[in-house]
Amino acid sequence: MKVLVSPMSVAEAIEAIEGGADIIDVKNPAEGSLGANFPWVIREISELAKKYGKEISATTGDMPYKPGTASLAALGAAVAGADYIKVGLYGVKNAEEAYEMMVGVVRAVKDFDSSKKVVAAGYGDYYRISSVSPLDLPEAVAKAGADIVMVDTAIKDGTSLFDHMKIGDIESFVKLARDNGLMVALAGNISWNHIETLKELSPDIIGVRSIVCEGDRSSMIKRELVVKLMEAVHG
């Protein structure tokens, strides 16, 4: 189980890298759950992380249902140096729209560099934003050629993934992903009391920010908290 940590700046990226995070995820929480950062920020953090042998992911935003816009944004993240390109399917209402979004994104990214991984991200609190259910995503995004399916939370109000999806539904999501040949990632205000449950669910990747910040998700990432998390996950 790899740990993905989401810094907002180069200074935070250094904390995450030196704390031992597996994947450095470049996002901009000021623009939403999967808010996009600027290409030059992605590039700078990518160049830094690669020196330490770390992989980089980058979010393209909580996207409306606009496949062309999503494809262009995804290519931008790929060109800027991201190994994983993560697309938030915020405005997507059903499996058919998810397929249409992701097939364009996959082509844009893979035509540029076939080694890069495409991540389709749904939301555990989908019912609060009138979005597609995560359980409808694995088959559709696998058919589109995505590599990873993820679930996060859209509204960052202190509630977690586990407040919005039953354990059985998360288990089903993980199984559907694996049955469709996808890697699977779980995120959404993960806290210390979720770690053992996550080990049992055994996703390929967990995504965090709040748990490794000195205060809430808008405060600074601290390397000692990243170290503590890595020990908890792999201990």
From Swiss-Prot:
Disulfide bonds: none annotated. The active site is at K27 (schiff-base intermediate with substrate), K86 (proton acceptor). It catalyses: 2 D-glyceraldehyde 3-phosphate = 4-(hydroxymethyl)-2-furancarboxaldehyde phosphate + phosphate + 2 H2O. InterPro entries: 4HFCP_synth, 4HFCP_synth_arc, RibuloseP-bd_barrel. The keyword Disulfide bond does not apply. Keywords: Lyase, Schiff base. Its EC number is 4.2.3.153. GO terms for biological process: methanofuran biosynthetic process. It is an enzyme of class 4 (lyase). The keyword Cell membrane does not apply. Pathway: Cofactor biosynthesis; methanofuran biosynthesis. One of its GO terms (molecular function) is carbon-carbon lyase activity. Catalyzes the formation of 4-(hydroxymethyl)-2-furancarboxaldehyde phosphate (4-HFC-P) from two molecules of glyceraldehyde-3-P (GA-3-P). Belongs to the MfnB family. This is (5-formylfuran-3-yl)methyl phosphate synthase. It comes from Archaeoglobus fulgidus (strain ATCC 49558 / DSM 4304 / JCM 9628 / NBRC 100126 / VC-16). The lineage of its organism: Archaea, Methanobacteriati, Methanobacteriota, Archaeoglobi, Archaeoglobales. The gene is mfnB.
